């Protein structure tokens, strides 16, 4: 007999994951804050160690959101990151640096699910609109 299992309540599971990410995992990933020197679009990250998250990733995925705050996920150490990408440590800077915690890297951005979560957690009308676009284009088809 072939049994097929169906996941019910996938949207609520997604919401629960975002809440757990915000309260359990994300606080452990924070490295520091910086000021980004120069145009963010001219930063050429080594895609195996550093990618965009949050607003810049949303802009790259949707071409809809012009970033005001920046989020970088990286496996690089602090000194290497600052030197390589011309960042200035600044506890009030607009750029947050988080530890990259996944292995598979495709492209210039964090996985769409993570970008969506970052936008939802950051809040605001602009981020909500971009999050909805990402949800409908990248997440909902896979739920």
Model-derived regions: residue spans:
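Short, exposed beta-strand "edge-strand" segments with a Pro/Gly-rich flavor and a Y/T-containing core
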Residues: 2-8, 47-52, 104-110
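Short, cationic-aromatic polyanion-contact patches
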Residues: 2-23
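Short gly/ser-rich loop at a beta-strand->alpha-helix junction or flexible surface loop bordering the NTP-binding
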Residues: 24-98
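Hydrophobic alpha-helical interaction segments
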Residues: 80-143
């Amino acid at each position: 007999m072939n049994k097929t299992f169906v996941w019910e309540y996938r949207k609520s599971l997604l919401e629960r994951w975002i809440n757990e990410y915000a309260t359990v995992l994300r606080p452990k990933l924070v490295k520091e804050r910086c000021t980004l020197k120069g145009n963010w679009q001219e930063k050429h990250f080594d895609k195996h160690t550093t990618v965009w998250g949050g607003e810049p990733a949303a802009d790259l995925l949707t071409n809809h959101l012009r970033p005001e705050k920046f989020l970088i996920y990286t496996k690089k150490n602090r000194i290497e990151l600052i030197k390589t990408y011309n960042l200035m440590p600044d506890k009030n800077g607009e750029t947050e640096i988080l530890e990259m915690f996944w292995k598979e890297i495709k492209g210039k951005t964090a996985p769409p699910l993570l970008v969506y979560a970052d936008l939802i957690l950051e809040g605001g009308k602009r981020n909500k609109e971009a999050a909805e676009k990402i949800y409908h284009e990248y997440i909902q088809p896979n739920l």
